[in-house]
Amino acid sequence: MKNPFIELYGCMCLTLLTLAPQPAAAKTVGEVPPADTLRTVFFTDIHVTPGNVQDSLFRIAVAEANASDADLVIFGGDLTNMGSDRELAHVHGLMSQLRKPWFTVPGNHETTWSESGCTAFRRLFGHAGCVATRAKGYLFLGYASGPYMKMADGMIRGEDLAWLERQAAAARPGERIVSLCHYPLNGDLTNRQEVTETLKSVGVTASLYGHYHQLQLRNFDGIAGIPGRALAGKRGEAPGYTLLDFFADSVRIREKPLGMPPVTRYTVCLKDDPQILALPCDPLPPAPDAEGRMRLVVQDSAMVLTGAAFCGEVLCYGNSQGALRAYDTRKGRELWRHVFPDGLYTTPLCTGGLVIAGAASGGIWAFDARTGREKWHLPTQSAVVGDGITDGGALYIGLGTGSIGKIDLRSGRLLWRHDYGCGQAQGRPALADGRLVFGAWDRHLYCLDAGTGELLWKWNNGSGSLFFSPGHVVPRIAGGKVFIVAPDRVVTCLDLATGKQLWRDNSRKSRETTGLSGDGRRFYYKTMDGELAAIDTSAERYRELWCTDLGWGYEYNSCPAFVRDGVVYVAGRHGTVAA
């Protein structure tokens, strides 16, 4: 069905001026007059893909914003669907047609599936997630909420909280500080309490948010949650956006349907509004109870986004500030570090006295495990965000979007490269019987000849949605079969030799967390209801051996299960571990 708003405005020819994004940091401090009336357009969850309905709707919205009396345009994230380089460049071009000052933060759709490891956003918008903007006596502090390169709850990086404190300390006298975060500051953030306490300590009383696609006031531990609606709206709802009018001590929230007059939905005091304080807050998560069962090895000032690898007593991992660290757990000190320009997402590999890591800034690197001296470096054309596997003196790993390769561990020489088209191969590949099996964010699971890189077969689940791709799965191989659980919430079994689909089962809602017993007889997977199930790998059809409720409730964090000495270890989205 044709959208009447698209048909009405489709023939409009817009000649619009380009305006670059606002700088990522506030400027010099000084006296400012008391906060004045500030009229803003608040766009969030616009979800633009070239050629989709939102693409047309957003062009109309930009024209309306340009014709309005708004002083400032604010974007609350989820500008795209998959966060691809193509989508980001396209939506940035549309945003640049605004003739008003504007700034944006990323949403989870820019950070969870980013093929560039979140580097394209920084390149286009001038910051990696933190942005400060001043307007008429207001200081807006925007920051990213993740999750980063995997399905998980949101989290504000420690370095971003430190940035918030520095920016707030530099606020001009009389300036009112407003927070902007794509995620609501509630139970959907793993460190929500730390975030709200930080904001309150620097005088923030209101936070703009999106993510939920609807206009609903919220109480973020005493901070007023000011919502923005999605551009497309719910089924049967007119497309539109949000207008926020700040009046020094209050904000008026208006809904603006495309082509129609705005409608006032709420008026909220910016401090201690009774209607906000009367709303319930999400309960705080229980305090950790691992006393006596857990030992802190190292506390990092940045967010750890990789898995851990051990070279004997040396722990190796990467963080969100691009530091690859080697930490001696016995002596309790750092041995060495190498800092890359962007965050690290690949779990390091320790083998043959080498530490190997891929970089979101591009390239695969090998370092001497003892000294940190670079041994070799293989350039790539795009970000490396996937995990690798070693076997027989070779490394198998994604070489950026659309390709995977085999690398000689000693020299760093590329032995073969297979180009499959597009999408990152993010999950760790599996190797058996001379066959390399991996998934990609292009809807397909691939099987290659490990010796030559020749394609033997590929499979997809029949869905046209990239969101259901097996891009972050770790295939498990046992008895000549391949077992996977992808975001389509189905357990799938394929024949390793031919790629023939043997069976699929959706009796339980499953996600990417899987494991395999040491003898290969049991395949483990975590359900979205917080259960751990085991199935018989030798059975001709799905045969469940047992299912244990972990007591976690709703669960979707993708973290491979770890099996050792007959015990399965599995982690949850709230930082809990079960065995």
Residue ranges and their predicted role:
Residues N319-S320, A359-A360, L399-G400, A440-W441, ...:
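Structural signature of WD-repeat beta-propellers
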Residues D85-P173, E194-A206, Q216-G228, K234-F247:
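Extended active-site neighborhood of metal-dependent phosphoesterases/phosphodiesterases
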Residues F5, P23-A89:
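N-terminal active-site segment of His-dependent metallophosphoesterases
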Residues P288-A309, W336-L349, W376-D391, G400, ...:
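Extracytoplasmic beta-rich repeat domains
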Residues D328-G332, D368-G372, D408-G412, D449-G453, ...:
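Short loop/turn segments that connect beta-strands within beta-propeller blades
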Residues T133, I223-P286:
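Binuclear metal-dependent phosphoesterase catalytic core
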